[in-house]
């Protein structure tokens, strides 16, 4: 036998206090609180990520629908042993101070006189108003069931916490304690939760171990609370109990969980095992059996007048059309059908609210099972779909029911074959996906190795780049310096060339002047040499004459020089005389 575990989520308003010791998880030993919270809010975080504050508020309001937050009263009752242990632990630290104070007071009473009674009164007296075990919070209680069934075998982990879904309000806390009295020794704590649902409350019972919870489940599940009333104890295993704020996305859908509506007549949760769900136009849901016992046309809860025709005020919340409307049985959202704009189906995709009812004929559609569930119920023994027992007496209605049942059987068989086909296809896809994942992992490892090698190479190249940049900077500095020096040298060369031209012109002029000066000097030297020769000749002649006798000198002084004609050659005898005369003439010129 298998059961579905439930998840209880308390969605609180922003200003509401958080109840103490409400959180629980059957997988607490396997996962930490942070991991559990992260897994719980994964879909909500993914849905709200990257949205603005206005968009987040709109999404949260869309999933809340017409549900309103009310006061939820939580009464906690702990085991007696725990209370005794807590009391002892509270008294232990104060035992020594009390004894010391008493001894100090006794010693003071011996040494001093007793004081007046007014002085012995304490300055401050502590007191507590109200019941400390009762907490009042403001929010909405959500009940989810897991899509995966859990076996009731002993070796399968389930939970150490059970939930009594519907306890009648006629049962007081004292009556409830009597009901669970045989298991008082193994119960750690009980939490009685009262919300806006009238005439009932819910109880969370935490046991010491899962074996104790299994014993209580086997003994009390389906058992009447007392022999007078017909109400029975409906127990479910609690996989997780959590408290979340509304702004964190507590009303958003949770992966692998389905939120269950409840019948407002019998106050029982409406699971797929209890089909025939009907929701009136005033947004109250009932079991088909509960509503059939109501002969009036008004709503059993609010006395709203029901009519078979669609109300004109009803319209799609998205596009505003008033035909082919479907109402969500979880939050009351009204959307158009798949033949208009598919807003009802889009609401299911966004919120995972499974059941929707057509407003015109009250037919209920299950989006998860993809079939109608308003005329079919599931047998509790074998789980097969059986015909809903209609109380109508007309033959026409029986024929219609038979046709509907036949169509449902045909649809079920076809869906079963489709399920097998798609499951096989999913297996093949999973196999191919696993191979692709392995290939991608291999490629990923290779890519990681390449990235590591490229990173090493990149680091080396960066170092080389830095060294080259430093060298380039140095070379640029040197080039700039050399360019400056080259400019200076070019300017200097230009100046030198200009000076060279000036000097060359001056040199030419100096050479020309030197030549003229040299020519003049040569002429002067020639004249001076001739004069010097004449002087030397004169001096030599004078010396020679000075050595001659006096008569000769006188003869020379008185002698005359005659210049003969050049045509007749001179006789040899006159040669000496000619020479003598020329010398005399020179000597005279010299004198």
UniProtKB/Swiss-Prot annotation:
Any GO BP: MAPK cascade
UBP-type Zn finger ranges: 300-392
Coiled-coil features, chain-numbered ranges: 430-536
GO molecular function, one term: nuclear localization sequence binding
Binding site for Zn(2+) 2: 328, 331, 347, 353
Comp. bias regions, Polar residues: 108-124
Tissue-wise expression: Isoform 2 is highly expressed in testis, lower levels in brain, heart, lung, stomach, colon, uterus, liver and kidney. Isoform 1 is only expressed in the testis. Isoform 2 is predominant over isoform 1 in both fetal and adult testis.
Pfam families on file: BRAP2, zf-RING_2, zf-UBP
Parts of the chain that traverse the membrane: none
UniProt biased composition (Basic and acidic residues): 82-93
Positions where Phosphoserine occurs in the chain: 52, 116, 118
Gene3D superfamilies to which the protein is assigned, alphabetical: 3.30.70.330, Zinc/RING finger domain, C3HC4 (zinc finger)
Biased segments, Basic residues type: 581-591
Any one annotated GO CC term: nucleoplasm
Task performed by this protein: Negatively regulates MAP kinase activation by limiting the formation of Raf/MEK complexes probably by inactivation of the KSR1 scaffold protein. Also acts as a Ras responsive E3 ubiquitin ligase that, on activation of Ras, is modified by auto-polyubiquitination resulting in the release of inhibition of Raf/MEK complex formation. May also act as a cytoplasmic retention protein with a role in regulating nuclear transport.
Protein name stated in the entry: BRCA1-associated protein
Protein's organism: Mus musculus (Mouse)
Name of the encoding gene: Brap
């Amino acid at each position: 036998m298998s059961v579905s575990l439930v998840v209880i989520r308390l969605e609180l308003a922003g200003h509401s206090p958080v109840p103490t010791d409400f959180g629980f998880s059957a997988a607490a030993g396997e996962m930490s609180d942070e991991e559990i919270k992260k897994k719980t809010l994964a879909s909500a975080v993914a849905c709200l990520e990257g949205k603005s504050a206005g968009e987040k508020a709109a999404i949260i309001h869309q999933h809340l629908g017409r549900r309103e937050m009310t006061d939820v009263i939580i009464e906690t009752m702990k085991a007696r042993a725990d209370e005794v242990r807590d009391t002892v632990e509270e008294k232990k630290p104060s035992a020594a101070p009390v004894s010391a104070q008493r001894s100090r007071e006794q010693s003071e009473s011996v040494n001093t006189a007793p004081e007046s009674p007014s002085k012995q009164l304490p300055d401050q007296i502590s007191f507590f108003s109200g019941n400390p075990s009762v907490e009042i919070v403001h929010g909405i209680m959500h009940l989810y069931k897991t899509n995966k069934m859990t076996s009731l075998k002993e070796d399968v982990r389930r939970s150490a916490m059970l939930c009594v879904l519907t306890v009648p309000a006629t049962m007081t806390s004292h009556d409830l304690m009597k009901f669970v009295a045989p298991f008082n020794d193994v119960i750690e704590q009980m939490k009685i939760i009262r919300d806006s649902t009238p005439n009932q409350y819910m109880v969370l019972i935490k046991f010491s171990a899962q074996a104790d919870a299994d014993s209580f489940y086997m003994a009390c599940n389906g058992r009447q609370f007392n022999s007078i009333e017909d109400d029975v104890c409906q127990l479910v295993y609690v996989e997780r109990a959590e408290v979340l704020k509304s702004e964190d996305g507590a009303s958003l859908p949770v992966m692998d969980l389905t939120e269950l509506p409840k019948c407002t007549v019998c106050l029982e949760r409406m699971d797929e095992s209890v089909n025939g769900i009907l929701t009136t136009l005033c947004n109250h849901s009932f079991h088909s059996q509960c509503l059939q016992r109501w002969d009036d046309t008004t709503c059993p809860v609010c006395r709203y007048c029901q009519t078979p025709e669609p109300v004109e005020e009803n319209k799609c919340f998205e596009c505003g059309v008033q035909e082919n409307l479907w109402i969500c049985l979880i939050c009351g959202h009204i959307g158009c059908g798949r033949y208009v704009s598919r807003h009802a189906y889009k609401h299911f995709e966004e919120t995972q609210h499974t059941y929707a009812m057509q407003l015109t004929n009250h037919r209920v559609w299950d989006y998860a099972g993809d079939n109608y569930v308003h005329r079919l119920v599931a047998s509790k023994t074998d789980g097969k779909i059986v015909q809903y027992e209609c109380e109508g007496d007309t033959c026409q209605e029986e024929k219609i029911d038979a046709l509907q049942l036949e169509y449902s059987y045909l649809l079920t068989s076809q869906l079963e074959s489709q399920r097998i086909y798609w499951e096989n296809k999913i297996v093949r896809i999973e196999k191919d996906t696993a191979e692709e994942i392995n290939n991608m992992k291999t490629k990923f490892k290779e890519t990681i190795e390449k990235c590591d090698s490229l990173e090493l190479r990149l680091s080396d190249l960066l170092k080389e780049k830095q060294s080259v940049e430093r060298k380039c900077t140095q070379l640029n500095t040197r080039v700039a310096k050399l360019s400056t020096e080259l400019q200076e040298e070019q300017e200097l060369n230009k100046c030198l060339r200009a000076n060279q031209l000036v000097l060359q012109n001056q040199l030419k002029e100096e050479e020309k002047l030197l030549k003229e000066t040299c020519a003049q000097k040569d002429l002067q030297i020639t004249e001076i040499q001739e004069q010097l020769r004449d002087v030397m000749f004169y001096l030599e002649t004078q010396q020679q004459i000075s050595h001659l006798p006096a008569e000769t000198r006188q003869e020379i002084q008185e002698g005359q020089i005659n210049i003969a004609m050049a045509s007749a050659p001179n006789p040899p005898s006159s040669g000496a005389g000619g020479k003598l005369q020329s010398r005399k003439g020179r000597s005279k010129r010299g004198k």
